[in-house]
Structure formats: C-alpha cells, structure tokens
A protein has these predicted regions:
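Short helix-loop capping/hinge segments that flank enzyme active sites or metal/cofactor-binding pockets
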Residues: 32-102, 139, 145-148, 178
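Gly/Ser-rich, acidic/histidine-flanked active-site/gating loops
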Residues: 1-47
Length: 193
C-alpha cells in the first residue's frame, strides 16, 4: 500500500502537485553541524567505544565488515572538509542565507498558499534542516532491493504536537519498520550498539 493511500486511510486530506520551491542548499552546513553534534554527543558518553567521528572512521576502516554496508562518504566529508565548529564565517553566512530563503520565501509560503498543516516529502529532504523547522522521518517501506526508505513530515514553526500526531498515525498505520539485520556481526564490537 502506498504511503499516500495510508495517509488518506488515516483521514489526511492530501493536496497534490505542491512543488517545493527551489531552496538554496549548501550541504556543507549540514556537514559542519553533523560533525559538531556527533562529536559532542560521543564525548559525553563514556560507555561508547568511539568518542569522536574520527574514531568511528578509523574503527570502520579497520573493521569494514562490521559497518561499511552503506559506505562512509558523509562521514569522511564531514571529518575532512569541515572544522567541526559552527563559528567559521563561511558557515555563518551560508546558514543565514539558506534559512532566509527556506523560511519566508520557501516552506512557509508553500504551506500558507495551500493551507497545509504538515508537508510530507518522500525520502529525506534537506528543506527542514535548512529552514530550522521541525521534521520527523518515519519508515515507509522497502525498495525492490530491500533498502529501507521513509517519508519526511515537516511542520510549521512550533508545531511539534501536530507533527508528532501526523507522523505517529502514519507510522502505526503503515507498519513499515523492520528491525535491522546484522548478519554475522558481533554487536559487542560495533560502537554504540
């Protein structure tokens, strides 16, 4: 059953053909934040075997069978192409420009124009992190080659209760989540598991 049919079955009124406005996207912003936040999280938990992004990269470099099923492109890009701090002038300027475009000229204009409570996007979208608006990604199914995919629910500023209700209702109706399979992996050796 398609994700949109599940939503209709749950009572959603769908508005089709709402094209997301072109949002200025600079993925380096997300990479800066990813590295900074991941390092901050890892450093606060002494039980974890890896305490930095670099240590995770080194671990998977030494143990590719344990976790390289999906590659390390984003990890490497964040580690080696950003400082890991959000004080770089380029980061600050790019983030401000992206947020202006995504907020007033982008998502809010689209949601107001179509009277939307929640915007639903197939897969992962960068419109929410760029805008700073709340979002939730929930499982929606699997591709023909058994790769999981989800739908992203994006809300208006401070609309978390509405967003959570919509995403939770969909998730309960779709029942698309499957526990991950760790074939032949000793989870005691994988950081964070």
């Amino acid at each position: 059953e398609g994700a949109y049919r599940v939503m209709e079955r749950c009572g959603a009124i769908l508005v089709q053909d709402t094209n997301l406005p072109h949002l200025r996207s600079d993925s380096s912003i997300l990479l800066y934040e990813f590295k900074m936040c991941l390092n901050a999280y890892l450093s606060t938990n002494p039980a974890l075997k890896c305490r930095t992004l670099k240590e995770i990269i080194d671990f998977y470099g030494d143990h590719p069978k344990e976790g390289l099923k999906y590659g390390m492109g984003i990890l490497l890009d964040a580690e080696y192409n950003t400082s890991g701090t959000c004080t770089d002038p380029k980061y600050i300027l790019d983030k401000a420009a992206c947020q202006r475009g995504a907020q007033e000229e982008g998502l809010l204009k689209l949601m107001d124009g179509h009277k939307l409570d929640v915007l639903v996007c197939p897969g992962i979208t960068d419109c929410s992190p760029i805008s700073g608006y709340p979002s939730i990604i929930v499982p929606a199914g699997y591709t023909s080659d058994n790769m999981p995919f989800g739908v992203t629910f994006v809300g208006r500023p401070f609309s978390e209760p509405t967003l959570i209700r919509a995403a939770y209702s969909f998730e309960q109706a779709a029942r698309a989540r499957r526990a991950p399979e760790f074939e032949g992996i000793n989870t005691d050796t994988v950081p964070g598991i």
